[in-house]
């Protein structure tokens, strides 16, 4: 989805093509850095918030409810309270699944390090905390939006929760999902789960509907 893809039509054609791929995971990490155009200009970024929003809209148009994640820097030199609020409002409007938040760190030899208007660590911390709270809200809301959906889940490990054995994995959207341990599936298998509730914070669980891929041929023969 970079600028190299050219005009809107070509970007739309590209998104349509990846949406048709059966093995494509609908999880896209699109680094934003800031939702404020003034700050993006100071960062020498070659895109603006409207273009970024348009690309997010294309992904949602053709992939339904994909997981969109991003990176945001707070406290870049000369970032005013208004600039930060613009960035915050933009992040809120896109409604990312996850936002990785970084406080600007001055690095010797960079152009940004020589800029005036360096913010204090206390100012950066306040802005970071606000973004972190928004991120937590968005993550919970996205996970909740998946309740009732059928998720394809790769089982990654066996754990004990409240005295019971569970398999933990991630869906194609990278949502943490747990199912009770059973003999007909195991770690490294891919299953379909109907998400019904939260087992614990940020972990969905539900009914296993089918086995999509069994990792060991011998186990597959035994089950069949």
Give, region by region, the residue ranges found by the protein language model.
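Terminal RNA-binding accessory module
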Residues: 114-211, 215
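Conserved beta-strand positions that form and line the central face of beta-propeller blades
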Residues: 39, 168, 222
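OB-fold and OB-like beta-barrel modules that bind single-stranded nucleic acids
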Residues: 28-30, 99, 155, 194-195
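Single conserved hydrophobic/aromatic residue that forms the stacking wall/gate
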Residues: 1-9, 212-224
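Conserved non-cysteine loop/helix-boundary elements of the Radical SAM core domain that shape
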Residues: 3-98, 104-123
């Amino acid at each position: 989805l970079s600028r190299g893809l050219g005009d809107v039509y070509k970007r739309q054609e590209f998104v349509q093509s990846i949406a048709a791929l059966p093995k494509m995971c609908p999880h896209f990490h699109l680094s934003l850095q800031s939702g404020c155009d003034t700050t993006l200009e100071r960062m020498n970024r070659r895109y603006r918030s409207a273009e970024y929003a348009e690309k997010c809209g294309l992904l949602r148009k053709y992939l339904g409810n994909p997981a969109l994640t991003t990176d945001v820097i707070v406290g870049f030199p000369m970032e005013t309270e208004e600039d930060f609020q613009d960035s915050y409002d933009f992040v809120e409007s896109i409604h990312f699944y996850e936002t990785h938040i970084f406080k600007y760190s001055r690095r010797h030899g960079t152009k940004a390090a020589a800029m005036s208007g360096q913010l204090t660590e206390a100012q950066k911390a306040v802005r970071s905390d606000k973004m972190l709270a928004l991120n937590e809200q968005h993550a919970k809301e996205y996970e909740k939006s998946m309740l009732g959906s059928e998720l394809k889940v790769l089982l990654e490990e066996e754990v004990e929760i409240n005295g019971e054995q569970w398999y933990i994995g991630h869906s194609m959207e990278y949502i943490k999902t747990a199912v009770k341990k059973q003999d007909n599936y195991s770690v490294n298998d891919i299953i379909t789960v109907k998400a019904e509730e939260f087992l614990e914070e940020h972990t969905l669980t539900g009914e296993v509907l089918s086995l999509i891929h069994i990792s060991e041929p011998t186990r597959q023969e035994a089950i069949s």
